[in-house]
Amino acid sequence: MIDTFHYPNRMGRIILLSMEEVMGRNGVNAVLNLSSHKTLIENYPADDSKLNFPFSTVSALGGTLEQVYGPHGGRGLATRIGRACFNYGVRQYSGQMGLT
């Protein structure tokens, strides 16, 4: 039996919102469409702690970025998206993490 691991929905939401900030809504929709995650188009996960966002989805999104934009472009976009994720997470949840 293969175990599947999941991120909290909140993390999946942060990743998708950060992608939208960097690539725009149409760019995110195109990546979601190409990675066979059409159910997430205009339907981001809830802002809660439930573990329902699979690691495999995050992996597929990264792979699709590289497929569409090439190795260098995909890596550059992934870096910018990662920075946006960090900034978004700190901005939204600094109080919960004890940051001021």
Can you describe what each PLM-predicted range is?
Residues S49-T100:
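Amphipathic interaction/junction segments at domain boundaries or subunit interfaces
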Residues R10, S35, N43, Y69, ...:
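Functionally constrained cores in energy, signaling, and assembly domains
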Residues D3, L32-K38, R83-N87:
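Short, compositionally biased low-complexity segments
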Residues M1, R10-R13, L40-N43, D47, ...:
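Generic, low-specificity signal for short hydrophobic/alpha-helical stretches with a mild N-terminal bias
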Residues N26-T64:
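N-terminal interaction modules that seed assembly of large macromolecular complexes
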Residues M1-L34:
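Charged, compositionally biased N-terminal leader segments and the immediate start
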